[in-house]
Amino acid sequence: MKHGIKKRKLSRCTEHRLSTLKNLSISLINHEQIVTTLPKAKELRPYVEKFITIAKNKNTLHGRRLLLSRLHNSKLAVDKLLNVLASRYQDRKGGYSRIIKFSTRKGDCASMAVIELVDRDIAARGKVYSKNKEGGKVVTQS
């Protein structure tokens, strides 16, 4: 019986699956829209929404350290979460991302999906949030 099985395994061992989800979440936070397979997108959605909730509710040193430990020490993604996304979603109580079904992949006919952040900045498409040498935050072309 399959009682209590809630997560998808994605044909990966635990370490590889968690690493895949962390890397996908960093990409989604940086670019605010990514194209991936539908099962990965469905598994990624609650994972990223928990990060946004932590950034929104715990905008302290403890929250920063929690996010750094869960996002492969990606300081740029954590800075964007705490400075940009937390203020953007301050009035929203949940549902920070949406999944739009896409076509199938040509090679293996896998169902593809676009996962994006709601109310994303469309003008920032293809740009990455980064720091300059003086410590200020800038948006650069990727």
UniProtKB/Swiss-Prot annotation:
A GO biological-process term: translation
Species per Swiss-Prot/TrEMBL record: Wolbachia sp. subsp. Drosophila simulans (strain wRi)
InterPro entries: Ribosomal_bL17, Ribosomal_bL17_sf
Keywords: Ribonucleoprotein, Ribosomal protein
Protein's name in the database: Large ribosomal subunit protein bL17
Gene Ontology MF terms: structural constituent of ribosome
Gene3D superfamilies reported in the protein's UniProt record: Ribosomal protein L17
Lineage summary: Bacteria, Pseudomonadati, Pseudomonadota, Alphaproteobacteria, Rickettsiales
Any matching Pfam family: Ribosomal_L17
Gene for this chain: rplQ
Source domain of life: Bacteria
